A protein has these predicted regions:
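Single transmembrane alpha-helix segments in multi-pass membrane proteins
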Residues: 3-55, 60, 76-81, 223-230, ...
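Membrane-interface helix caps of multi-pass small-molecule transporters
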Residues: 23, 48, 72, 76-81, ...
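Transmembrane alpha-helical segments in multi-pass inner-membrane proteins
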Residues: 192, 196, 202-267
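Helix-loop-helix "hairpin" substructures at the membrane interface of multi-pass membrane proteins
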Residues: 70, 130-215
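Loop-to-transmembrane alpha-helix initiation sites
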Residues: 10, 86, 113, 133-138, ...
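Transmembrane helix-bundle core of multi-pass membrane transporters
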Residues: 85, 89, 96-153, 183, ...
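Alpha-helical transmembrane segments within multi-pass membrane transporters and channels
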Residues: 21, 54-94, 99, 244, ...
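Cytosolic-side transmembrane-helix boundaries in multi-pass membrane proteins
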Residues: 165-172, 176-179, 239, 251-297
């Protein structure tokens, strides 16, 4: 039971990051590599702040804000300096590597030791550690989905979505496209850093390399959600990403259960899985077209 709860909790935690990836990948139509630097940034900030005596909840908020600053930098590089989106993420990611190490006191990883975390504080109310992680992960996912759903129904949210759908049309209607892109970058990377901070508190340490593969997990969760469940409102789509993240996590756990698996091949399996997941929508289209042709014959 604890194993199942732990797996669900980890999937729910990943879903927060996946929603951040969704905002740039689907809403803004941008492949943002900043995620791989924002994730360990959140972890580095929360661990260093907790060790400095900051309340874990405040430290988690600082991690969220740090991620938004990283998103601001990426947004400025992309919109004001006209650096292509993919290269923008790589530039910010490279810079964040050094920044994250400096935040952690010039060491590549930093342990929380016996310091308080948001999960330990919840567990002190009578919950087991697994129940505390699951409860807070679910609460965070629901809160993020609620806030973003409400935001997307406001004028700012509608403008943000139109920016990703049709830039020329948005500009023709007087929308400041650059500002909207920057806002999208900030929200996205803020959520990714928040996820990194929660993972660091759950794992008990931060590591400068913890963001490696983050974009793979996020994209996989988003595509799995889209393949499994179609035609949803924005709120439903955000919630479905949580399901996608859980499914992805369960698939990865099954890969780890393969007998005599060489651990060096795990990332190869991850890459193959992502390729298959990305191909799934195209496969669905081909099968649908083929089915229509057979009916017409």
């Amino acid at each position: 039971m604890n194993f199942v709860l732990s797996s669900l909790s980890e999937g729910l935690l990943w879903s927060i990051m996946a929603i951040g990836v969704y905002l740039t990948f689907r809403i803004l139509d941008i492949a943002d590599m900043t995620a791989e630097g924002a994730f360990p940034l959140g972890a580095a900030v929360v661990v260093s702040q907790i060790q400095a005596g900051t309340n874990p909840w405040i430290a988690t908020l600082f991690a969220l804000l740090a991620g938004m600053v990283a998103g601001l930098v990426s947004g400025m590089l992309h919109t004001k300096m006209k650096i292509p989106a993919l290269l923008t993420g790589i530039v910010t990611l490279t810079g964040l590597y050094s920044i994250n190490i400096k935040i952690m006191g010039s060491v590549p990883n930093l342990s929380l030791g016996d310091s308080a975390t948001v999960f330990k504080q919840l567990a002190s109310l009578g919950l087991s550690n697994e129940e505390a992680v699951f409860s807070l992960s679910l609460a965070c996912l629901l809160l993020v989905c609620l806030v973003l759903t409400l935001l997307m129904k406001t004028e700012i949210g509608l403008v943000l979505r139109s920016t990703g759908d049709n830039i020329p049309m948005s500009e023709a209607n007087g929308v400041n496209v650059d500002t909207m892109k920057i806002v999208g970058y900030m929200i996205s990377n803020g959520l990714i850093a928040l996820c990194g901070s929660l993972f660091a508190q759950n794992d008990g340490f931060s590591d400068v390399t913890s963001g490696t593969g983050t974009i793979v997990v996020g994209l996989s969760a988003v595509i799995i959600a889209e393949v499994l469940i179609h035609d949803l409102t924005i709120g439903g789509r955000l919630l479905s990403i949580g399901i996608g993240a859980i499914v992805y996590r369960l698939i990865i756990l099954n890969i780890y259960e393969i007998p005599n698996l060489d651990q060096n091949l795990v990332r190869l399996f991850n890459a193959i899985l992502l390729a298959l997941v990305l191909f799934a929508p195209e496969l669905q289209k081909r099968l649908k077209i083929r089915g229509l042709k057979l009916r017409n014959e």
